[in-house]
Structures are given as C-alpha cells and as structure tokens.
C-alpha cells in the first residue's frame, strides 16, 4: 500500500533538508490513511461517518502525543532527531482543541512518519503504526 502513493523515494539527506512542517503534513496524511484503512478493514459495515469518528480518536493531537510517549524510547538517534525537529518547529497555526505541548509532540510524530514514509522505511513505519494501534485501543 505505501509504495503506491509515493512519486519517488527521497534519500535520507534529501528528506533531512525538508522543512519539518513539510514532513509533518505528509506524515499527517499517511497516518490518517493508515488509520482509516485499519478501521475499515476491521469492520466493513461501518458508515463513513463512524469511520471518521473512530479515526479522530487515533489522529487527534492528544492521541499522537500518547503514542510518542510510548514509542520515544524505541526511536533510533536519527528518528529522535527528526521527531525533535518536528516538535520544535514554529507552526503558523495555533491548536484549537489541544494544548500546545500535545500539539507540538503530535507535529513531531507526524514529521517522523513523513520522514520514514518519504525515505521508504516500511519496517519502521509498520512498527510505529502497529504500536499506535496497540496504544490507542
């Protein structure tokens, strides 16, 4: 599934040169698609609205912050650096439904997902996605 969406694979150097908010916007989309697909796969009888509502439980800033708390110890040095760049990035938007700390951690999480996706690191993406499902049951 993941290969189908990428136009090309970025080298690690190319991905590191991207703005962390660019990585985060890609990571946000990829994580959302994964979660919605996971929910639909588990119950094909759900309406689109129910899939959406269930997905929110996984993709909201508070949930992504919880995921980061749990997986941070498993990150490589490189992954931790990407996460921290995303977390510390100055965002032009202010969170409406989350506190700033959760929002920043969620941005770091999304930057990490975007980085792993663009560089084609499917093994680490699968690890993070599977852990996310376990954590936010």
Predicted features along the sequence, with ranges:
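Double-stranded RNA-binding/processing signature
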Residues: 1-137
């Amino acid at each position: 599934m993941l290969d189908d969406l990428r136009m090309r694979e970025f080298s690690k150097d190319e991905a590191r040169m991207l703005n962390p908010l660019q990585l985060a916007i890609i990571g946000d989309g990829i994580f959302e698609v994964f979660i919605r697909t996971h929910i639909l796969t588990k119950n094909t009888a759900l309406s689109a609205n129910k899939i959406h509502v269930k997905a929110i439980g996984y993709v909201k800033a508070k949930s992504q912050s919880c995921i980061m708390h749990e997986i941070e110890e498993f990150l490589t040095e490189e992954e931790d650096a990407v996460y921290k760049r995303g977390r510390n990035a100055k965002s032009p938007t202010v969170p409406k439904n989350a506190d700033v700390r959760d929002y920043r951690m969620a941005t770091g999480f999304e930057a990490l997902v975007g980085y792993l996706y663009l560089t084609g690191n499917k093994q680490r993406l699968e690890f993070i996605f599977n852990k996310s499902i376990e954590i936010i049951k």
